Amino acid sequence: MNDLIALPEISHVLPMEVLAVFNNFFTAELTTLGKSGYPVTWPVLPVFWPEHQKFFIFTPAGLSQKTVNIRRDPHVSMLFSEPTGSDLERPLAVLVQGLAEAPDRMHTSISYLDPELLAVVTAQTRKLMRRQPAMKLYLFNPVSRYLMDWYFMRLMITVTPHRILWWQAGDFSRSPQIMEVDHVV
C-alpha cells in the first residue's frame, strides 16, 4: 500500500492497487436510483480517465433506462468486485460513489471523443478484444451493425467520484479504507 499516485485537481493520493482495479477490471456494477427511489443495478464497462478524474460509460440508446434514472437523480455508485479476466491476484474490491451526467446527445461513432479519451477507450477495446475475440464478429460485421444499430448508437455517461472505498482482497467482512474526493460539489 506504499505505492501512491498523485491525482491532478485533487489534494489526495490514490493507492496504486485502486488504480490497478480501475485499469484492469472489465466490468463494474453501476447503481442508480429508479423512479420509486429504489436502487437499480446494471453491469457496465467503465473507462477511467485519470487525467480528468472521471469515469465514462457508453450505454446503448436502446438500453437507456440508466440515463433516465441519472437525469432524475445524479447520485450513483459503481462497485468493482468481479476481477475475472483482470490478471490481478487477490485485488481490492472498490466502490466509487459520485455524481453522474447523462446528456441526451446520441453518438454513432467514437470519433467525437477528445483524442486523449479516445486513446483510453481504444486501449480498453483492444484489451477486451484480446480477452473476447468473438467480439470482432459483431463489431466489424456490417450485417450485425445494420441489424443491431440501436446497440451501436451510444449515450455517454460521465461519473465524477466524490468518495472511494476499498476492501483488501475483496473482503467485505473487513472495514473499508475511505477516501473523500473534494472536487465534487
Predicted feature descriptions by range:
Residues 2-29:
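Short, basic/aromatic recognition patches
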Residues 34-38, 86, 149-151:
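A short beta-turn/loop motif at secondary-structure boundaries
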Residues 25-62, 68-70, 77-81, 90-95:
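Short beta-strand segments
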Residues 60-64, 73-85, 134-144:
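Short acidic (Asp/Glu) patches
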Residues 1-10, 89-185:
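Charged, gly/pro-rich active-site loop segments
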Residues 63-65, 173-174:
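Short, surface-exposed beta-strand-loop junctions and turns on beta-sheet-rich folds
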